[in-house]
Amino acid sequence: MFFDVLTLFPGMFASPFADSIMGKAVKRGLVQITAHHLRDWAEGKHQITDDVPYGGGEGMVLKPEPVARALRDLRQRRPHSRVLLMTPQGKPFCQESARQLAGEESLVFVCGRYEGFDERIRSMVDDEFSLGDFVLTGGELAAMTIIDAVGRLVPGVLGNRDSAASDSYSDGLLEYAQYTRPAEFEGMKVPDVLLSGNHAAIARWRRQQQLLRTWLRRPDLLERACLSDEDRRMLQELQRQADSGEQ
């Protein structure tokens, strides 16, 4: 899968994808991440990419011409690219977004800087994404996050293909609690069921933990989650136990 990034700071992308899982994926050729300097498509002696805003105001605004030239060039190289704009005004990025984007052949990220970007740039992209209700100094960190979230879903990137299936949000719920050795640490014990070897009981406990943790921490997710009748029965019982102080 190809990831192309339009940015004024291409050096930011070297380190995050040099190591760990994504670093290995790059070395194996499963993903290709290329950060392009937007100034390469700017014209004139000074290769200006931003200018003062019409109507006055603070900061500088990213000009539309370099972005338009860059996107035309990149789309010629990879005609099936989907272009994403990183902006606080975009739709919230979530695990379902990552799953959908992982089905694309190529993604292009447009990273804003300074005060923002010329409104006409919006007409050049396919989607606008935001990481949340906060503002970063630029779109680069958002692009890195989305590349990581999407890239790990590319076939072959994760060593165990079932790993992504059990992640938080993979089925609309938070992940169950995880434990490893030792069985007891500073008085805190691993739940007996995980040491029992009873796979059916372990699976049921893990599902209960998913439901309970989601209800306690992100109840909004339950409204959208696809729950079975058994899930609903377990959730009602967990809620009853919590209300009666049995938990």
From Swiss-Prot:
Main subcellular location of this protein, as a coarse class? cytoplasm
Compartment(s) of residence: Cytoplasm
Q: Which UniProt keywords apply?
A: Cytoplasm, Methyltransferase, S-adenosyl-L-methionine, Transferase, tRNA processing
Identify the enzyme class: transferase
Q: Which GO terms describe its molecular function?
A: tRNA (guanine(37)-N1)-methyltransferase activity
Q: Which residues bind S-adenosyl-L-methionine?
A: G112, L131, G132, D133, F134, V135, L136
Q: Does the keyword Isomerase apply?
A: no
Q: Which domain of life is it from?
A: Bacteria
Q: What's a single GO BP term from this record? A: tRNA N1-guanine methylation
Q: SUPFAM superfamilies in the record, alphabetically?
A: alpha/beta knot
Stored CDD domains = TrmD-like
Q: Name one Pfam family in it.
A: tRNA_m1G_MT
Its recorded reaction(s) are: guanosine(37) in tRNA + S-adenosyl-L-methionine = N(1)-methylguanosine(37) in tRNA + S-adenosyl-L-homocysteine + H(+)
Q: Which GO terms describe its cellular component?
A: cytosol
- Report the InterPro entries cross-referenced here: Alpha/beta_knot_MTases, tRNA_m1G_MeTrfase_C_sf, tRNA_m1G_MeTrfase_TrmD, tRNA_m1G_MTases_N, tRNA_MeTrfase_TRMD/TRM10
Reported EC number(s) for this entry are 2.1.1.228
Functional description taken from the UniProt entry: Specifically methylates guanosine-37 in various tRNAs.
Which HAMAP family does the record cross-reference, listed alphabetically? TrmD
* Family, per entry: Belongs to the RNA methyltransferase TrmD family.
Instruction: State whether it acts alone or in a complex, and with which partners, per the record.
Output: Homodimer.
User: Mind telling me what this protein is named?
Assistant: tRNA (guanine-N(1)-)-methyltransferase
